Amino acid sequence: KFCFTWSWFDGEQTANYDWDFSQYQPELIVVNLGTNDNSYTKGDADKCAEFENGYVNFLKEIRAKNPNSEILCTLGIMGQELYPSITDAVDTYKTETGDSKVSVFEFSVQDSENNGYAVDYHPSAVSQKTAAYELTNAIEGIYGWERVELVDDGVDEMTKDDDVEFNNVVEESSSEE
């Protein structure tokens, strides 16, 4: 199955779709999973073990559908508390399966002091751009793939106040619904 969300986009609720994974096999799958799980695990060893077990099973599911793809497991832009659990899960997965095409990468935590926040403390546009460069550097370093420079979209010129204004527009539009 593919595409489920708890929210709507342009007034349309998405749903689960049968997906033929053989139609497209990516060279790289980036998994950025675990940010919200920290509110459940809260450092509890049993809950962290449960998270790790679920993560291992998720990697097995990804690999079953994408047998030749590299997998890069990331976390950190909104908090790094579960990163050790992710590295443990990846180590467990690799030991169990012998799969050497899975790597990990830890993002820097967003610099909200200088870059502000987007909605609900999510990374601002500037923080997203910083993360994109971090991820690009990691991919280049881990896989040796040549970088293609991004087109400068001027986002690095956005200030913290610009994002605050964006937040106000988003909050106003969501309260009108």
Regions found by a protein language model. Name each.
Residues 50-69, 75, 89:
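Extracytoplasmic, non-cytosolic globular domains
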Residues 66, 97-99, 161:
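Short, well-ordered coil/turn elements that cap or connect secondary structure elements
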Residues 16, 54-58, 134:
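Well-ordered alpha-helical segments embedded in enzymatic catalytic cores
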Residues 15-24, 60-65, 95, 142-145:
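Surface-exposed acidic, glycine-flexible loop patches that form ligand/cofactor-binding
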Residues 1-49, 77-84, 118, 122:
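Conserved SGNH/GDSL esterase-like catalytic core that processes O-acyl groups on lipids
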Residues 151-177:
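Ser/Thr/Gly/Pro-rich low-complexity, disordered linker/stalk segments of secreted
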Residues 27-32, 70-75, 103-106:
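Structural recognition of the beta-strand scaffold that forms the well-ordered cores
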Residues 39, 77-154:
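Catalytic His-Asp segment of secreted/periplasmic serine-dependent ester chemistry enzymes
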